[in-house]
Each structure stands twice: as C-alpha cells, then as structure tokens.
Amino acid sequence: MDTNTPAPGKRIHTVVQPTARSQLRSVVGYTPESYTVHYIRDDVKAQYSDEKIQSAIEELRLGTLEQDHIDSVFGAVHGNQQCRIDVFERAIELNFVLSDGTGVEVAFDREWGTDQLEVIKQIQATLEEW
C-alpha cells in the first residue's frame, strides 16, 4: 500500500461513521498508481491478506473503465451514473468513480441497507421461481 500518494476518500470515514456506526466495513480510496485504506474494521481486515486487498483494488480500478460506456448508453435517459452498488451476502459496497482508475469504495454490513434491500430480496425471490 502506498501511503505517500494521497488517494481520494480521506474525509468519507468521518462523514459516514456517525450514521453507519459499527456497520461500516471499509473506506478505500484508489488511483491508477496507488490506494489508501482510510478505514477497515478489524474483523474485516482479519479476512484479507495484502494480496487480497490488492486484488480487490485492481477489480475496482477495472470497474471504472466502463463508466464512459455506461454513461453513453444510459446517460441521455437517466443521467450519468453516480455510484455503483454491489450487494453481497454479508456486505453492500458503494463504488464512486471519479475518473478512469480512480474512485472511492465504501462498504457496509448488509443490514445497513435493510430497507433498501427489501426490494432486491423480492426481485431475487421472484427470479428463483422462474
């Protein structure tokens, strides 16, 4: 991890922590050249080796490269994409793309988005029936 090069997202932890409380899992800023783990909860950190963290950051960087394409397809109707949301069994990740290879990832425990996830659960249940 390169801590000498500033990556975006330093203030996000202080902004999000009061409302997220113990459900905040991580805040990571990344650029094409470096990344900074601004916050990672101890139990989450225990599950990640340095190699796994680097692999996850690389995946986030790759995801930024599709931003222009997504905006060109959906932008005229929906406006530009502001944030990508990935829902996992135990976590919700928000990825805010700032430019190619640059962004901020904020992860929460899945329970953090319980109200919003109800719609997703209903859709998943319907698709399982199909």
Language-model region placement:
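Non-catalytic interaction/Regulatory regions outside core domains
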Residues: 1-130
